[in-house]
Amino acid sequence: MLVGIMSDSHDNLPLVKRAVEFFNAEGCALVIHAGDIISPFSIAVLNKLACPFRAVYGNNDGEKVGLKLKAAALGGSIDNPPIMVEADGITIRVLHDCGDWRAEARSSGADVVVFGHTHQVVVEYDGEDRKILGINPGETGGWLSGVSSVALLDTAS
């Protein structure tokens, strides 16, 4: 199962649209957004996804009721972090601001921790058998770095 991961889109609609097109082209079965969508009009772009989406609020998501209503109307969901998502037998803990993703994984029992907030890409393994994974997809919006980024998680590998 392929899971698309994005974060910190910050209302940059052209780059959110590009991410949606990428996730659809890759055949993602689920998309996770790790916060800072910002406005309800921005979440509407996720309507073009060919799969369900799950999201958490970020520190800049002020209009929470509007975001929640819009996500629900599109068949997705957005909730206060952290949330746990099950994908093909893999447990994924999703939050926005994560001080120590390894501690989050250990305390929650998650296989994967997805987070955002820093706008910096992180893909790191932890544990003796390297079976615990931390993923920060960077920033989909590209406002701080000038680079738009997302991540893919293949649950089979």
Where are these regions (language model features)?
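Acidic, histidine-bearing metal-coordination/catalytic regions of metal-dependent phosphoesterases
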Residues: 1-2, 53, 152-157
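Internal catalytic-core helix/loop-beta-alpha segment
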Residues: 80-123
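Active-site neighborhood of phospho(di)ester-bond hydrolases with catalytic His/Asp-centered motifs
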Residues: 6-7, 30-36, 53-59, 93-96, ...
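Active-site environment of divalent metal-dependent phosphoester hydrolases
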Residues: 10-15, 38-41, 60-66, 99-104, ...
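N-terminal active-site segment of His-dependent metallophosphoesterases
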Residues: 1-48, 62-64, 68-69, 73-76, ...
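Short acidic, glycine/proline-enriched helix-loop-strand junctions
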Residues: 43-54, 128-134
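Binuclear metal-dependent phosphoesterase catalytic core
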Residues: 79-88, 108, 128-157
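Helix-adjacent hinge/juxtasegments
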Residues: 50-98
